[in-house]
Amino acid sequence: MIHKNWAELIKPTQLEVKPGNDPARQATVIAEPLERGFGLTLGNALRRILMSSLQGAAISSVQIDNVLHEFSSVAGVREDVTDIILNLKQVSLRMDVEGPKRLSVNAKGPAVVTAGDISESAGIEVLNRDHVICHLDDGADLFMELTVNTGKGYVSADKNRPEDAPIGLIPIDAIYSPVKKVAYDVQPTREGQVLDYDKLTMKIETDGSITPDDAVAFAARILQDQLSIFVNFDEPESAGRQDDDDGLEFNPLLLKKVDELELSVRSANCLKNDNIVYIGDLIQKTEAEMLRTPNFGRKSLNEIKEVLSGMGLHLGMDVEDWPPDNIEDLAKKFEDAF
């Protein structure tokens, strides 16, 4: 049965987010357990998406009074234009409106010009307001117009130059990605009695426009969306649902008691100790949940999976409205059918 290709793989059941020194920017995200090899597969894919594909905001061009090109200097400003541009690249923004938008800086010396001196605009927030842009000497004047836009990844300066760009407009390399650093590590982990699983640990740092755990969530959603085109079949209907002449809305096999299955003594005792009475109780358990049962190992798991497969069922199924209120009466009603 095709569903066994994915239904029999263990799925991560634990996702832990450990905030860093700055919770809005730094966090460690831990997911486990994963099938062996999936830690590397998912870690590498998520890292690439985090660094390249999330939407962010950045300054894409600047126009400075009395400056024609980036290799100029401004009277009374200690930094040359090239240094000012480098500093503008590091301004972190949160932008909740469609771009491009125009902002400005108007300062008089003596002064230290910071990102906090950038004019305010609805829907745009400067996050690192203490970031230094330049220093003005006494009597110096500085006026800049900044173009702010949204995008993803890295966009070079030549692509940020409009076709109708006025003289003096200097395009800037825009780094839109809100994620600054991503590192991941894969370690072995235990699930029940089995040691052969992966634990994925990701350390993430953002610019503050998005939290690390949200960044991972968005990256996972992007990956999910990109992979969906490769699924070239329709999911079979859940074996847990079945309308019949008696109005029963699930497979009557789910009313069969697990002690009627031909299981080993160890497996049967484990199910009994875990208060699993009916097959309907059993199939809603995931592999990870079963492996956490005391004295329940991979051998018992494979035995149960084989028995369920012969009935057209598998672990991890979803059965709505289970258990029914009159489960004992229903079980007796369908007892002869078993």
Swiss-Prot record:
This is DNA-directed RNA polymerase subunit alpha. Belongs to the RNA polymerase alpha chain family. The keyword Transferase applies. InterPro entries: DNA-dir_RNA_pol_insert (IPR011262), DNA-dir_RNA_pol_RpoA/D/Rpb3 (IPR011263), DNA-dir_RpoA (IPR011773), RBP11-like (IPR036603), RNAP_asu_C (IPR011260), RNApol_insert_sf (IPR036643). Keywords: DNA-directed RNA polymerase, Nucleotidyltransferase, Transcription, Transferase. It comes from the Bacteria. It catalyses: RNA(n) + a ribonucleoside 5'-triphosphate = RNA(n+1) + diphosphate. Residues 1-234 are annotated as: Alpha N-terminal domain (alpha-NTD). Pfam families: RNA_pol_A_bac, RNA_pol_A_CTD, RNA_pol_L. It comes from Ruegeria pomeroyi (strain ATCC 700808 / DSM 15171 / DSS-3) (Silicibacter pomeroyi). The N-terminal domain is essential for RNAP assembly and basal transcription, whereas the C-terminal domain is involved in interaction with transcriptional regulators and with upstream promoter elements. GO terms for molecular function: DNA binding; DNA-directed RNA polymerase activity; protein dimerization activity. NCBIfam families: PRK05182.1-2 (NF003513), PRK05182.2-5 (NF003519), rpoA (TIGR02027).
